[in-house]
Amino acid sequence: MVRNVDDLDFHLPSHAQDMLDGLQRLRSQPKLADVTLLVGGRELPCHRGLLALSSPYFHAMFAGDFAESFSARVELRDVEPAVVGQLVDFVYTGRLTITQGNVEALTRTAARLHFPSVQKVCGRYLQQQLDAANCLGICEFGEQQGLLGVAAKAWAFLRENFEAVAREDEFLQLPRERLVTCLAGDLLQVQPEQSRLEALMRWVRHDPQARAAHLPELLSLVHLDAVPRPCVQQLLASEPLIQESEACRAALSQGHDGAPLALQQKLEEVLVVVGGQALEEEEAGEEPTPGLGNFAFYNSKAKRWMALPDFPDYHKWGFSLAALNNNIYVTGGSRGTKTDTWSTTQAWCFPLKEASWKPVAPMLKPRTNHASAALNGEIYVIGGTTLDVVEVESYDPYTDSWTPVSPALKYVSNFSAAGCRGRLYLVGSSACKYNALALQCYNPVTDAWSVIASPFLPKYLSSPRCAALHGELYLIGDNTKKVYVYDPGANLWQKVQSQHSLHENGALVPLGDALYVTGGRWQGMEGDYHVEMEAYDTVRDTWTRHGALPRLWLYHGASTVFLDVSKWTQPSGPTQEH
């Protein structure tokens, strides 16, 4: 057909939504609905075409050669009427309210009737609700319902928060097999080891008649040589469950005396740093070379830097580092020379258990000078692309895949991000000098951002860095020694004790109950470059200097993990200042 210059292509933007709204209204007129679902005595008029589009279960039912394919009334058994009603409403409106009271029923019914989008959002909701009181139950529920990603993230939460979980009632109800799995975890992050011993004793005391026989086996899972001697002596002297068992007495005595038990690992929380180009390399105009060491950890107890296996991509800057499930992830960054650079989509992982770097699935977009943060069992990367929008994506380590996330509402290019209280917080401004900071918050359950108007938010910070500790968000910049803390519950910022020094191109990370700041600074008329570190005691509101980083890194990323410090004996540094 020949088009005429007067032809008009008309598009009604609201047409699709109008049709859905109209079909929803037609449900109240049974004559205009072509199928009625019968659920526990409740009748739900609807349209089989919409059900088939929303659910493979209904598509197979209505498109196949079954009695239901031709029947005007279809009965669904062994499902809750109210929940099916919610799912049918979702088909017509795209809206669903998930609560702690209905999430399990919704998950089960969505799995039964094959509503994949509902299963996915219920899984995200469960991850959002993870805490010490429910993580064991959510882990078991996830395994039962085939939500293996949810189960994996609940298991990771247990590993990272074992001491808190062990104090909850759910822990006391664990079957023996499950408890053994918990205690035997190679990466169970327990400090001190006494906590593991106290947890198993609490479990046995909850039902001593049935559980006392398992005590010798459970004791073999504890690093008894790391338990303080007074604790062991007290158990031997006053605990009936120990006194009545020769095997238990022998295990405690033998383990603490260092008799022929195998040497077991002792995990300690340490600060890890991956360095980019260093000052000496820039001055020489050279590419970084292997052998200089670009990956190290700081043992805050011994106050020493020790070398780790080098990050294999030496000539890179603008990358971001985050830790998740006690694994270290490095994403993005730029490669090439100063005059010819390009961003990468590369992502690397350093699993502590394997102790070597390996590539993981590449990001969907190349990113440089972006932020990354762990939240609810996933890694989020924020910004760093070439568009004038803050593009976001998330990485699921269970599926080794990246998923696009809603972009931030307000564009920022001078920013930092951190996960806190189940939300992702983005603090930043545009690159324009003295452009005011904005605070944005992302809810992973609804995949939605909001801009938070918060009193006393600092007006401007150059290269802001933020980190979460004890449910609060700490914020610093490289143009000031001032330190700010944000309480999300009260929506209030306040100042705390200032740092001793300025820190450029560094990181702010929580380690135990303290915050560590790393980064360099130029000092003196000749422009000497120093890379210093200091720690903030949140209880005493004081800063303490911790010396230099191993090398004069102009760019680096940092985080914290738990590792067996006895396995790493090669020193890293000390730095020779210029």
From Swiss-Prot:
Source taxon at top rank: Eukaryota
GO biological process terms on file: proteasome-mediated ubiquitin-dependent protein catabolic process
All copies of domain BACK, residue ranges: 153-255
UniProt keyword terms in alphabetical order: Kelch repeat, Repeat
Pfam families: BACK (PF07707), BTB (PF00651), Kelch_KLHDC2_KLHL20_DRC7 (PF24681)
Gene: KLHL30
Originating organism: Homo sapiens
Top-level taxonomy: Eukaryota, Metazoa, Chordata, Craniata, Vertebrata
Record's protein name: Kelch-like protein 30
UniProt-listed Gene3D superfamilies: 1.25.40.420, Kelch-type beta propeller (2.120.10.80), Potassium Channel Kv1.1, Chain A (3.30.710.10)
One function term, GO molecular function aspect: ubiquitin-like ligase-substrate adaptor activity
Kelch repeat segments: 270-326, 327-377, 378-422, 424-471, 473-513, 514-563
Xref: SMART domains: BACK, BTB, Kelch
